[in-house]
Amino acid sequence: MWTDAPRHETDDDLAVTLRSLDLFAGLPSHELDELATRCDVSSAHPGQVIQAQDVPVRLWHVIVGGHAVVQRDGTPIGLLARGDTWSEHSLLNGLPSPTAVVALSPLTLLTLSRRQFFEIPEQHPVLAGRLVARSATSADRLALLV
């Protein structure tokens, strides 16, 4: 199973990275700076499982570099790239992930724990709205409908 790698970027570098991603576009600088202090930087190598299928979702990730595949029962159902996230629906609802996410190339990820993820609505209301919208169309929610 995948584990966190040591943090290699400063909070300032992370804030710059967040600003460059569509999900965080237009958020106030002070919110991005604060969010950057909460994010961990992690990495994965090709073939590494980032989220296993049928396992509770405990972390929320944003891809900042590389590509991953979303699989259900070993069958690819989607691709993820820079700026993509997954499992919002499962994380929000305390459900096991109906899909697996596997690195296709070396990945760099920004990661929040489930507890940190649940702090977003209070501290970052605009971002919270965007995440709820993404949850409605996330691969893990759509996989439940199949």
Say what each PLM segment does:
Residues 1-146:
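Cytosolic regulatory regions built on CNB/CRP/Popeye-like sensor folds
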